[in-house]
Amino acid sequence: NGLTVNKLRHAVFNFGTGNHIVFADGVNPAIIFNGTNWKEIKSSHSGGYDASNNTAGGAQAVNAPALVDIFENHVFLSGHEATRAAVAHSAPNDPYTWTAAAGAGQIAAGFDVVQIKPFRDDLFVFGNNSIKKINVNASNDFALDQVTANVGCVARDSVLEIGGDLMFLAPDGFRPVAGTSRIGDVELETVSKPIQATLVDIIKNEDMETLNGVVIRSKSQIRYFIGDSTTDASDSIGIIGGLTNSSGSIGWEFGELLGIRASCC
């Protein structure tokens, strides 16, 4: 189709029939590999696994998702440029079937979806200026609840889980989705005030689509790298954040990175 693939995202899962991996790139259909065969997920497919061809799917699928994750034994896809507010999910325990009759569906986020990430018992749906979460209600259906309409995520690949929280880059700095003592409630406090001016400048002047993030769990660190193949390595910048223990209190410290260009993490 002449479009360029800039990033490939994936999720690994096992719904009881062995390990699978599903890929999404925002240009082509999502594709699933079961260790032997590849199957494209297309909305034009009638649904289910078909050994005679290389496609699967159903009418509830989105055809060129940029985002993929696993939640409650469903494959979730989103980030299709033509339907930016749609969050699609497969039938339960069946990544190849995307028909409503089998239990697949689409959820309208109400805004352009930047990222989807499971955290505890919810699937968080990030927009540029709003955050919602998908959970399973008493009727065993997926329900969409508002988290905040006052803040969102400005960098798709900034959303990382570390230290029991879900970190993301907001317009005013890094914020964690932190669970509180009240069931179902979250906190969204800024944790990067010491470098807020630096972060605001980076957001203003850099392409957030080129941001890549990684968690270094052995060091309780997150590292973000900004820059793509068109950026000289010497001009590539980034942010490093680490959880520290000072006098029995856990907190964040941040610093700047320079000269490391990463195309993926």
Task: Map each language-model feature to its residues.
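Surface-exposed loop and turn segments in beta-propeller and other repeat-based domains
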Residues: 45-58, 99-108, 187-207
